[in-house]
Design a protein with these regions (language model features):
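N-terminal signal-anchor module of multipass membrane proteins
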Residues: 1-90
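Cytoplasmic-side transmembrane-helix entry/capping segments in multi-pass membrane proteins
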Residues: 83-92, 131-142, 249-257, 297, ...
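Membrane-interface helix-loop-helix junctions at boundaries between adjacent transmembrane segments
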Residues: 101-192, 196
């Protein structure tokens, strides 16, 4: 394996190489490559998002985050169908992520929920056909981030331009990387494979319904940062109930641990570098191969931003309450939903929770 190929490995792959190292020299080499990868990734992410902030305004830095997520995921991941059709779907997904979250914010919570259901139905049914690829962690997360950080007026006009640029970049990279691959299925096959008795379709419907309902309830209860509850719900909804239970436990424990760690750092560090706690969390995520640890470090970035608006106590209370509500509601919703949905004997779609 070349140096460049090793840089392309995910956290689990890099850690597996470290574990299998037979000599200290080999282990030190793999550790060095791993550290270079983390540093290069962080530097690139910081540079990329900063460019979007400069071009389209600080209030649209979240656009840089969403575009970056899509670029990093879809340079490797696919939609399981013909490359040309997949590219057109990606362009459609960007239109949906640009328009629907903004419109939903203009409506009442209930009407917004209905629009969110319709938007997520397209994203999930056509973009998340293979649960093992976790495309929902990109598409639905991107949608929720844009929903939570909505803008108006001139800022929204700049967001339109930023998302158009992001769509062009993502579609270009996706098509270039996948054009030589052969796919036997097309868009029509995705529609024909919709089956409410299959574990995949039930999982998709759960995502489509549960996440907008969580957002709606949080907003009706006047809970700030409703997107946190939606993101928490999205992240734990899986085809396997066993995996769901695992993620619910890890999400709750991870967020509480993250809150404690953030609070300690908040009091130990000078106020001038509070913003860098989020970057520290990003580095931690880079070293984390397991969901539980990712939940811990993801908390840093969210709290670093929220603490500026709500103060430390308010941000911590919101983070814990929104996450516990989101994952517990999602688990209860899916248990009831799966219970009432028709069943058939089939080979279950398996998605590991790690």
């Amino acid at each position: 394996m070349t140096f460049y190929q090793e840089l392309q490995l995910n956290q689990a792959g890099s850690k597996n190489l470290l574990k299998k190292s037979k000599t200290l020299k080999e282990k030190l080499y793999h550790m060095w490559v791993y550290l270079v990868k983390i540093a290069a990734t962080m530097a690139f992410c910081f540079f990329f998002v900063s460019i979007f902030s400069i071009l389209f305004g600080n209030e649209n830095s979240i656009v840089g985050v969403v575009v970056l997520l899509c670029l990093m995921v879809f340079r490797n991941a696919d939609l399981g169908i013909h490359t040309g059709q997949s590219t057109m779907l990606l362009a459609l997904f960007f239109v949906i992520m640009t328009v629907c979250p903004h419109l939903a914010n203009q409506f009442s919570p209930v009407l917004g929920m209905l629009l969110n259901i319709a938007a997520l139905a397209v994203l999930i049914l056509f973009g998340c056909h293979n649960p093992s690829m976790f495309n929902q962690s990109t598409l639905v997360l991107g949608y929720l981030l844009l929903y939570g950080y909505d803008v108006t007026g001139k800022s929204y006009q700049m967001r339109l331009v930023g998302m158009a640029l992001g769509a062009a970049l993502t579609c270009f990279v996706f098509y270039r990387n996948h054009k030589n691959r052969t796919y036997k299925r097309n868009l029509k096959d995705l529609i024909q494979e919709f089956d409410i008795t299959s574990s995949r379709t039930k999982w998709q419907i759960c995502q489509i319904l549960c996440v907008p309902i969580v957002l709606c309830i949080a907003e009706l209860c006047n809970m700030p940062r409703a997107m946190w509850a939606g993101i928490a719900a999205m992240s734990v909804i899986l085809p396997s109930m066993e995996d769901m239970h695992y993620r619910v436990r890890k999400r709750i424990v991870g967020n509480i641990a993250g809150v404690i760690c953030f609070t300690v750092l908040y009091f130990l560090l000078p106020s001038s570098i509070y913003a860098y706690i989020g970057i520290l969390g990003g580095i931690g995520v880079g070293f984390s191969a397991q969901y539980g640890w990712q939940a811990v470090f993801n908390t840093f970035g969210a709290l670093a931003i929220a603490a500026e608006t709500y103060g430390l106590q308010g941000a911590v209370s919101l983070r814990v309450s929104q996450n516990v509500f989101g994952v517990v509601f999602a688990l209860a919703f899916c248990v009831i939903f799966y219970w009432f949905m028709p069943k058939k004997k089939e080979s279950e779609v398996t998605v590991h929770a790690e």
